[in-house]
């Protein structure tokens, strides 16, 4: 794997390989989301429909994934077409530059909501193009009901608590089936989910990604 535009940086816990977001098109390790067939894309941080309430990407082109994650996404598309014809993956976030991760972290300063945002000092896996946020849309293009919204920072969003939510009625069986379908498509394709966000999926082990992959600034 090649690193483009290496930048030295102080105050980092790992010897990150860094690249400016503006240079990403020149790096062959990354693929545009538009090159992945049969997905829908609505990058929520490129608009105001997010927990910060403003466009965080501006002129930055963030519709990219590392080619390994893009290949996993393609596998998920194939699996979903076979097992739930007419349904598609809707990508809500993919590459997230480190400078944007800092803004998210700072926005939640002093709150207990920081559990939902990776500490920039460690590096978000989004910033390596190795994570994505996604949901599903039906054949009519409507988002499936997952029981909580994207970036909803409540316990209803926690996959590890789904059994409890089903028992109390906080999550319906249909909502749970929708989450299971999303997880099945992505986790059978090489991604891993996390405990507190049903929409978030990562490729490979975090420490390996942070040590070996290019972080986009």
Where are these regions (language model features)?
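Extracytoplasmic cell-surface/polysaccharide-interacting catalytic and binding patches
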Residues: 1-94, 104-196, 204-217
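Segments that shape or occlude catalytic/ligand-binding pockets
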Residues: 97
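Aromatic-lined carbohydrate-binding/catalytic grooves of carbohydrate-active enzymes
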Residues: 101
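Conserved metal-phosphate-binding beta-hairpin within the catalytic cores
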Residues: 201
């Amino acid at each position: 794997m090649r690193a483009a535009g290496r930048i030295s940086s102080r105050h980092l816990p790992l010897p990150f390989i860094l690249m400016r977001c503006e240079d990403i098109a020149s790096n062959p390790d990354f693929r545009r989301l538009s090159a992945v067939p049969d997905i829908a894309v609505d990058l929520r941080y490129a608009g105001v429909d997010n927990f910060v309430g403003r466009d965080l990407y501006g002129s930055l082109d963030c519709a990219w994934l590392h080619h390994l994650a893009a290949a996993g996404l393609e596998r998920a598309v194939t699996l979903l077409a076979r097992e739930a014809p007419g349904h598609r993956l809707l990508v809500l976030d993919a590459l997230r530059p480190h400078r944007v991760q800092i803004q998210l972290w700072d926005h939640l300063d002093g709150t207990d909501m920081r559990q939902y945002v990776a500490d920039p000092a460690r590096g978000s896996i989004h910033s390596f193009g190795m994570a994505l946020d996604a949901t599903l849309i039906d054949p009519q293009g409507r988002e499936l009901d997952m029981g909580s919204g994207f970036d909803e920072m409540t316990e209803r969003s926690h996959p590890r608590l789904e059994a409890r939510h089903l028992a109390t009625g906080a999550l319906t069986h249909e909502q749970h089936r929708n989450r299971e379908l999303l997880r099945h498509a992505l986790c059978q394709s090489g991604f891993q989910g996390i405990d507190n966000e049903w929409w978030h999926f990562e490729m490979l082990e975090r420490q390996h990604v942070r040590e070996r992959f290019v972080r986009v600034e």
